[in-house]
Swiss-Prot record:
This is Calcium-transporting ATPase sarcoplasmic/endoplasmic reticulum type. Keywords: ATP-binding, Calcium, Calcium transport, Endoplasmic reticulum, Ion transport, Magnesium, Membrane, Metal-binding, Nucleotide-binding, Phosphoprotein, Sarcoplasmic reticulum, Translocase, Transmembrane, Transmembrane helix, Transport. It is found in: Endoplasmic reticulum membrane; Sarcoplasmic reticulum membrane. Its main location: endoplasmic reticulum. The keyword Transport applies. Residues 1-48, 111-253, 314-757, 809-828, 918-930, 986-1002 are cytoplasmic. The keyword rRNA-binding does not apply. Pfam families: Cation_ATPase (PF13246), Cation_ATPase_C (PF00689), Cation_ATPase_N (PF00690), E1-E2_ATPase (PF00122), Hydrolase (PF00702). The active site is at residue 351. It is an enzyme of class 7 (translocase). InterPro entries: ATPase_P-typ_cation-transptr_C, ATPase_P-typ_cation-transptr_N, ATPase_P-typ_cyto_dom_N, ATPase_P-typ_P_site, ATPase_P-typ_TM_dom_sf, ATPase_P-typ_transduc_dom_A_sf, HAD-like_sf, HAD_sf. The lineage of its organism: Eukaryota, Metazoa, Ecdysozoa, Arthropoda, Hexapoda. This magnesium-dependent enzyme catalyzes the hydrolysis of ATP coupled with the transport of calcium. Its EC number is 7.2.2.10.
Length: 1002
């Protein structure tokens, strides 16, 4: 039933043909079960394990590697016997890499849809219904409840379906619907129709939402929605329809993979094609087919060389290290790729309550009368510090610190705060923090009384828990609460009837302590307390009080005000009808006004500075809240989202105002706004959608079930540590401390991680380009193999992998939060960066081939061949004067390959040092600024020596130990790479990479 809130009780019952006293008949129940289905959220049909496994191989680079492995395996079957073992190493290693990557991918996918399943925890198991087949109330399984059923709920019950209230049996019924609407205090419900068909969930005061909890009271209602037709069911539908989007890094790596695959294909075909003339060379036994296969193997080796197999592992390791650093800053990352996405966040959409504020209501101002002479009067206006539930704070009057015990009226005010109250504060030892037990507003009054300590209780030597209840304990020795007249909507107040336990300044008789909305309480006040005396309260004095509370409730503070009063001679309990709440108004009469307290959910101390940092970093902060517009704007001024005098026209919208705009106007509003108030979940999702259409990268915070679709849709969903399991499951990140400034720290960490990733990607790619150039040169020039596939895999995975991982520990640049966020569509490799890759890569390839050629031609320990002999080595077996005296086996001597491999490894270690910074010289950023890098370089060299000097490994990798002369030559070929990169960095600093300045568009 749509718009059930706008229908009267009778209309709602008639819609389903429900008897308001006896419920549905069995026939009606069966009909409705067939029509509407079971009252449950359907189980998500996940992908099978084999579907997930196959998806992991749906990637171009992976397909190329898989093809290379299959071809290598087939070719290995035709190898000569002595080479069979080494031939199988290459395809085996490639397959192991692919399997490891697939396992990680499947594991991540398996966790992806847990958010939808987490919604199940909000489904109640049982419900209490009234049906015509049995008399009285019967318990049934919640999934058997149908639209039209009469359901009864009471304190502690979980609402089993969306219910339109028809009757309230208690004074009031309060519902904790924070999981659905984000409201921090429980909501008082009623049975009246709400005529607005477009009312948001917060305003549907006659609807009990499925999955929410009854905080107080007892009521009956008719079910208007079950299963997917409930508010929580609609959220489930929205979440299941939300498509997962790839992170900017994943998109860039996909693009990079496509480009690389095209380049690989062209080079492989080119290498094979340019050697067609050598297919019949004597080295292949004069067989054209054997020659074709030989060069096909070289093409496969080229593919293996070009793909950075170690890149996925290094990226995963770097992101995992980033998550550990973020965890220390209270940001728990659930999705690894989102770590990098944080670095390009351009908009943070933040919830107000609990994220920008403490979510701990706190009294900041209060007033009492100083003097009253006729209509001439003056007030004492106090201010209090402290913004949490821990009762620590100072009392100020006119900027001067004062003691509450010096003001008699404050003793009475503190007494009203404690006695007219059903809440408390509790010390949570695990969290080492104070928490509310009951209503936030009442808890603020308890904390106020403790801060005031108006009766000067000695708190010295008390532990934190005892210190926090000392003033309450003192007041409760003076008064005993007999009963409470609960809050009701008609009078907007509550009161407690108390009797004295011992004599006090307030007299010896019973009192009725009252608190409530200022207008309602003042209407029933006849007198006012001034010190210890009591004076008549004229209409002029009432107007002055209301004018002051009006100021408190608007402007910068927008405080929630409560008036406190006392009935000095209350009506006797025996003359009260406590069973009829409509008569409570008659008992709260002849009141004496005591004072007004103004409270707010105060901003967190660190938020203002965090927003200043966001502005400096070019990040827009949009506050999205369920609060009313005036309160939200006041908080935004306090935290720096708006300046004190800034006109918010066109920058602040309520949910209703936003809905009234055309689509074009809505997009324009999202482009410039900084505040959306009184919003619903679909507003959040729509805002994210529009931001994504503008190529903005948005981080969205939330804590309730209602926030889950937007959290899932945003590039970065950020759930609160105190939030619901659904929100946490849908989010990429969880804030352990619910603190906005932790988001800013995480963004800074994300930027640093991206910079480091660029460095190690550059490092690995230049290495791969070097390997490709090496193989291309040997094939194009007709030289013997300088590097074989198993060596390339060793370099790509192990030797290069360790320094690449260590580059993830590079310290962040000092000006990292003074630059604008990078654009999501910014290429991973710019034109200038590509030129640098090619320049370094070409040198790596040339030096590697040059080292092998040096051993053949110029080494004192080598064969002393001519360049012509070397480039025509495949003709050696055919005889001829050109190869007279040359042993043709020398062309497959492992020494030349060892020289090439050693130069490649050494250059890569020096190149790792070059990658400490994109543009900073090694003079200004020396290697020891990252000790992890020095350690990894040492380990890589050690591993290289192991494969050279351990016989079994040297056989597998076809290498051999080098002499001192050969090592000196290796260094001569390697060191120039540092000079080349320093030159390129100098050019970049002066010309190519001038950073953009941050422009504050908002």
């Amino acid at each position: 039933m749509e718009d059930g809130h706008s229908k009267t009780v009778e209309q709602s019952l008639n819609f389903f043909g429900t008897d308001g006293e006896r419920g549905l008949t069995l026939d009606q129940i069966k009909t409705n079960q067939a029509k509407y289905g079971p009252n449950e959220l359907p189980t998500e049909e996940g992908k099978s394990i084999w579907q997930l496994v196959l998806e992991q191989f749906d990637d171009l680079l992976v397909k190329i590697l898989l093809l290379a492995a299959i071809i290598s395996f087939v070719l290995a079957l035709f190898e000569e016997h002595e080479e069979t073992f080494t031939a199988f190493v290459e395809p085996l290693v490639i397959l192991l890499i692919l399997i490891a990557n697939a396992v990680v991918g499947v594991w991540q996918e398996r966790n992806a849809e847990s958010a939808i399943e987490a919604l199940k925890e909000y489904e109640p198991e049982m419900g209490k219904v009234i049906r015509q087949d049995k008399s009285g109330i019967q318990k049934v399984r919640a999934k058997e409840i149908v639209p039209g059923d009469l359901v009864e709920v009471s304190v502690g019950d979980k609402i089993p379906a969306d219910i339109r209230l028809t009757h309230i049996y208690s004074t009031t019924i309060r519902i904790d619907q924070s999981i659905l609407t984000g409201e921090s205090v429980s909501v008082i419900k009623h049975t009246d129709a709400i005529p607005d068909p477009r009312a948001v969930n917060q305003d549907k005061k006659n609807i009990l939402f499925s999955g929410t909890n009854v905080a107080a009271g007892k009521a009956r209602g008719v079910v208007i929605g079950t299963g997917l037709s409930t508010a929580i069911g609609k959220i489930r539908t929205e979440m299941s329809e939300t498509e997962e989007i790839k992170t900017p890094l994943q998109q860039k790596l996909d693009e990079f993979g496509e480009q690389l695959s095209k380049v690989i294909s062209v080079i492989c075909v080119a290498v094979w094609a340019i050697n067609i003339g050598h297919f019949n060379d004597p080295a292949h036994g004069g067989s054209w087919i054997k020659g074709a296969i030989y060069y096909f193997k070289i093409a496969v080796a080229l593919a293996v060389a070009a793909i950075p197999e170690g890149l996925p592992a290094v990226i995963t390791t770097c992101l995992a290290l980033g998550t550990r650093r973020m965890a220390k800053k209270n940001a728990i990352v659930r999705s690894l790729p989102s770590v990098e996405t944080l670095g390009c966040t351009s908009v943070i959409c933040s919830d107000k309550t609990g994220t920008l504020t403490t979510n701990q209501m706190s009294v900041s101002r209060m007033l009492i009368f100083e003097k009253v002479e006729g209509n001439d009067s003056s007030f004492l206006e106090f201010e209090l510090t402290g913004s949490t539930y821990e009762p620590i704070g100072e009392l100020f009057l006119g900027g001067q610190r004062v003691k509450a015990s010096d003001y008699e009226a404050l003793q009475e005010l503190a007494t009203v705060c404690i006695m007219c109250n059903d809440s408390a504060i509790d010390y949570n030892e695990f969290k080492a923090a104070f928490e509310k037990v009951g209503e936030a507003t009442e808890t603020a009054l308890i904390v106020l009384a403790e801060k005031l300590n108006a009766f000067s209780v000695n708190k010295s030597g008390l532990d934190r828990r005892s210190n926090a209840i000392a003033a309450r304990g003192e007041i409760e020795t003076k008064w005993k609460k007999e009963f409470t007249l609960e809050f009701s909507r008609d009078r907007k107040s509550m009161s407690s009837y108390c009797t004295p336990l011992k004599a006090s300044r307030l007299g010896t008789g019973p009192k009725l302590f009252v608190k409530g909305a200022p207008e309602g309480v003042l209407d029933r006040c006849t007198h006012a307390r001034v010190g210890t005396s009591k004076v008549p309260l004229t209409s002029a004095l009432k107007a002055k009080i209301l004018a002051l509370t009006g100021q408190y409730g608007t402007g910068r503070d927008t405080l929630r005000c409560l008036a406190l009063a006392v009935a000095d001679s209350p009506i006797r309990p025996e003359d009260m009808d406590l069973g009829d709440s409509t008569k409570f108004y008659q008992y709260e009469v002849n009141l004496t006004f005591v004072g007004v307290v103004g409270m707010l959910d105060p901003p967190r101390k660190e938020v203002f500075d965090a927003i200043v940092r966001c502005r400096a970093a070019g990040i827009r902060v949009i506050v999205i809240t369920g609060d009313n517009k005036a309160t939200a704007e006041a908080i935004c001024r306090r935290i720096g989202v708006f300046t004190e005098e800034e006109d918010t026209t066109g920058k602040s919208y309520s949910g209703r105002e936003f809905d009234d705009l055309s689509i074009a106007e809505q997009k324009a509003a999202v482009a410039r706004s900084r505040l959306f108030s009184r919003v619903e979940p679909q507003h959040k999702s729509k805002i994210v959608e529009y931001l994504q259409g503008m190529n903005e990268i948005s981080a969205m915070t939330g804590d309730g079930v209602n926030d889950a679709p937007a959290l899932k849709k945003a590039e970065i969903g950020i759930a609160m540590g105190s939030g619901t399991a659904v929100a946490k499951s849908a989010a990429e990140m969880v804030l352990a401390d619910d603190n906005f400034s932790s988001i800013v720290s995480a963004v800074e960490e994300g930027r640093a991680i991206y910079n480091n990733m660029k460095q190690f990607i550059r490092y690995l790619i230049s290495s791969n380009i070097g390997e490709v150039v090496s193989i291309f040169l040997t094939a194009a020039l007709g030289l013997p193999e300088a590097l074989i596939p198993v060596q390339l895999l060793w370099v790509n995975l192990v030797t290069d992998g360790l320094p690449a991982t260590a580059l993830g520990f590079n310290p962040p640049d000092l000006d990292i939060m003074d630059k604008p966020p990078r654009k999501a569509d910014e290429g991973l490799i710019s034109g200038w960066l590509f030129f640098r890759y090619m320049a370094i890569g070409f040198y790596v390839g040339a030096a590697t081939v040059g080292a092998a050629a040096w051993w053949f031609i110029a080494s004192s320990e080598g064969p002393g061949l001519t360049y012509w002999q070397l480039t025509h080595h495949l003709s050696c077996l055919g005889g001829g004067d050109e190869f007279k005296g040359v042993d043709c086996k020398i062309f497959s001597d492992p020494k030349a390959m060892t020289m090439a491999l050693s130069v490649l490894v050494t250059i890569e270690m020096l190149n790792a040092m070059n990658s400490l910074s994109e543009n900073q010289s090694l003079i200004s950023m020396p290697p020891w600024c990252n000790l992890w890098l020095i350690g990894s370089m040492a380990l890589s060299f050690t591993l290289h020596f192991v494969i050279l000097y351990v016989d079994v490994l040297s056989t597998v990798f076809q290498v051999t130990p080098l002499s001192a002369e050969e090592w000196i030559t290796v260094m001569k070929f390697s060191i120039p790479v540092v000079l080349l990169d320093e030159t390129l960095k100098f050019v970049a600093r002066k010309i190519a990479d001038v950073p953009d300045a941050v422009v504050d568009k908002w």
